[in-house]
Amino acid sequence: MTEAGFHLKHHLTSFQIMILGFAGVILLGALVLMLPIATASHTWTPFHEALFTSTSAVCVTGLVVQDTGSYWSGFGQTVILLLIQIGGLGVITAAVMFLMLSGKNISLKERSAMQDAISAPVVGGIVRLTRFILKGTFFVELVGALALLPAFCRDYGLRGVWMAIFHSVSAFCNAGFDILGRAGALYPSLTAYISDPLVNIVIMLLIIVGGIGFLTWDDVCTHRLHLRRYRMQSKVILSATAILIALSALLFFLTDFAELPAGQRVLASLFQAVTPRTAGYNTADLTKMSDTSQAVTILLMMTGGAPGSTAGGMKVTTLAVLAANAVAAFRRREDPQLFKRRLEPSAVRNAAAILLLYLGLTFAGAAVISAAEGLPLGACLYETASAAGTVGLTLGLTPQLGTLSQSILILLMFFGRVGGLTLIYAAFSGHDLTYARYPKEMITVG
């Protein structure tokens, strides 16, 4: 190793390594997707379109500028699936996996990076947890693919095997990519399966399992039904996930899908409640949903899943911390609480910072796109919320946007996957963060 390489390796923080890792994989994926072998027509793909697709795959978003099923060849779809898998696991986790397979020891620096990548509380036991994550991921994806086989093989014959594998991995990684499109029926997502209980239920379960986080899996597998032994964070994630799904499903049932039979209406409402929190699949025509439902969908997209999961967004824990802080303010309590545990002041500060970052970037991006494209702000906000939340739901605008607007979505997808605080910590690493403690003074708010 050169002196410069040694210096770089040992002076980069785990946050900087994470960001450079994601950026490197995205760039490599874009270069491969440009090749004629990656497209069904065997033509070169413009760099910007390849970069958008690679970013969407690695950031497990699902927004596309070309229909995945009809534009990309089998090789191109395989590359996209590999990028989705790396993005879902996380670049650091994938790198640690290759180190394990090669028999190399995992250094303390690599363990620390892994800790940050999956939001683990301590470095100890990180290798065991990584093995658990890898085994759990491939097991769940295999079971999901086997469960989807009957439906896809019924409709597509032997090609259904590949489709079952692709959609199982994409759903578990909360990516939302589909390969069901064909000439004359582009960007279909799962609309053909709105009345298929098997496909709906399997996809929903894969999305939920992928979106609750690896540490939550560890609690569930270790303590099973002994809920009191769960980490407070796992309790918050499971409770918030259940509440968000139940409330949004009820709202969608009351405001949409009136044309469907009762059973299908319940199924469609549930699916639409699960998928906005970073999965990106849809069984219904999103453009026909009510304004209320579209507004709620935007909020769900920004909320996202759990920390240390395949999901993006602000995270349900951020929402829970802000809600607990609001309750403490209403009750004039000094400390916000969740499940009989006081929250650290740093958690409240971080939650407020994340909220401001997501709101600011999402609305700013929507405003720029609206001005550049001459489109309604609300429709643009739907696309930017989908990008920042790494969701992939769209009202059909993304493929029609210009290069500037699509570049904004690329940046938002990257921001949504690596996380706002990760970007800030990486940017300010190495700076002297000591500060003077000034006198306190009250300020009136509200």
Language model segments and positions:
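Membrane-proximal intracellular helices of multi-pass ion channels
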Residues: M1-G446
